[in-house]
From Swiss-Prot:
Substrates-to-products reaction catalysed: (R)-pantoate + NADP(+) = 2-dehydropantoate + NADPH + H(+)
Keywords assigned: Cytoplasm, NADP, Oxidoreductase, Pantothenate biosynthesis
Binding site for NADP(+): G7, C8, G9, A10, L11, G12, N98, A122, E256
InterPro entries: 6-PGluconate_DH-like_C_sf (IPR008927), 6PGD_dom2 (IPR013328), ApbA (IPR003710), Ketopantoate_reductase (IPR050838), KPA_reductase (IPR013752), KPR_N (IPR013332), NAD(P)-bd_dom_sf (IPR036291)
Function comment: Catalyzes the NADPH-dependent reduction of ketopantoate into pantoic acid.
Organism: Salmonella typhi
Protein name per its UniProtKB record: 2-dehydropantoate 2-reductase
Family: Belongs to the ketopantoate reductase family.
Pathway recorded for this protein: Cofactor biosynthesis; (R)-pantothenate biosynthesis; (R)-pantoate from 3-methyl-2-oxobutanoate: step 2/2
Length: 303
């Protein structure tokens, strides 16, 4: 399959290496155009992938059968709109990022839109990406008109298992959002690995109660207890991980808070729900961001 991977960070390189190893025809797409992108990855089994792959080739993009987007949430809309005019109108666009809200920004895109949530863990160590832990990628149609692309899940299952197709992906996206609303802001504010959150069950419960109320209003059945149990499972299984938001804060980069807690706050307002704990955490992360963005280091760059 001919695939363009938009974004060549940790997640992008994980997909590029896996697709390449399994015989797919792939290219990367970088914000600053370059003819090649270096992919240096150590997999969970210790094997090493080190290759320069084609990048930013518009002719390749014009023949691509899939655009796999692994950017930060706040980069997605501008980048996808830029590339959509060259991508075949029948080729699906699969968004894999933390948070929600990008689909609402891309309603006018003609290509089929799919969205996904991933639990694989990968991190950068210098110039090398380390695939820390295997996980599952959940994918499904982003809009009602986007149809059944379950064959893609089968193809990607053979590349980077596990991959699960959901006819209604939004329920799974909300579950992932609940996890992100707990783990990302708390670890970013407390500067700790995920496992440290085990000692803060009251805080986790307060966040999950608010998220559960919003999810119920969105039309998906859940409970605060169910969400807490799920979040605590994720905390245990990723105890040594440094969350993506904490990595961003440590590197003084723009975070995805607007698409995680920020998205929850938007939907809560629509439903007339008060979410004071999530509001407080949102403001604290935004304040931390503004401290280093004022100095110019972490300003979000245009795509």
């Amino acid at each position: 399959m001919k695939i363009t991977v938009l974004g060549c960070g940790a997640l992008g390189q994980l997909w590029l290496s896996a697709l390449c190893k399994h015989g797919h025809d792939v290219q990367g797409w970088l914000r600053v155009p370059q003819p090649y992108c270096s992919v240096n990855l150590i997999d969970t089994d210790g094997s090493f992938f080190n290759e320069s792959l084609t990048a930013n080739d518009p002719d390749f993009l014009a023949k691509s059968e899939l655009l796999l987007v692994t950017l930060k949430a706040w980069q997605v809309s501008d980048a996808v709109r830029t590339l959509a005019s060259t991508l075949p109108v029948t080729s699906p666009i699969l968004l894999i990022h933390n948070g929600m809200g990008t689909i609402e920004e891309l309603q006018s895109i003609q290509q089929p839109m799919l969205m996904g949530a991933i639990t694989h863990a990968a991190r950068r160590d210098g110039n090398i990406i380390i695939h820390v832990a295997n996980g599952t990628t959940h994918i499904g149609p982003a809009r009602e008109q986007d149809g059944d692309y379950s064959y893609l899940a089968e193809i990607l299952q053979g590349v980077l298992p596990d991959v699960a197709w959901h006819n209604n992906i939004r329920a799974e996206m909300w579950r992932k959002l609940a996890v992100n609303c707990v783990i990302n802001p708390l670890t970013a504010l407390w500067n700790c690995p995920n496992g440290e959150l085990r000692h803060h069950t009251d805080e986790i419960n307060a966040i999950c109660e608010e998220v559960a109320a919003v999810i119920e209003r969105e039309g998906y059945h859940t409970s605060a207890d169910d969400l807490c149990y799920y979040v605590e499972q994720v905390i245990d299984s990723t105890a040594e991980n440094i969350s993506s938001m904490l990595q961003d804060v440590r590197a003084m980069r723009h975070t995805e808070i607007d698409y995680i807690t920020g998205y929850l706050l938007k939907r809560a307002r629509v439903h007339g729900l008060a979410v004071p704990e999530n509001s407080r955490l949102f403001e604290m992360v935004k304040r931390k961001e503004s401290e280093y963005e004022r100095s110019g280091t972490g300003m979000p760059r245009p795509w």
